[in-house]
Amino acid sequence: MPSYFEGKWAAAVLVIGDEILSGRTQDTNTNTIARFLGSLGIDLKEARVVGDVETEIVAALNALRAGYDLSLIHI
């Protein structure tokens, strides 16, 4: 599949959920997201997990937005 983007993009995904951090739920979607982005020519460079705390979510998202071409949120 051809890339739709000029140059190489870098992406990050922010995974939100106390259940992920506690181990009650396993994150099975980041792998799918990484493959999909790769098919578009976008490299997933970071996946960050934060709990359900608004200030932590905002801080993490702002950090990812500043460092990558594309930031995705997975709740």
Protein language model annotation of sequence segments:
Residues Y68:
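An anion/phosphate-binding loop that grips the pyrophosphate of nucleotide cofactors and donors
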Residues S71:
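Receiver (REC) domain switch-region micro-motif
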Residues H74-I75:
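Conserved small/polar residues in nucleotide/adenosyl-binding loops
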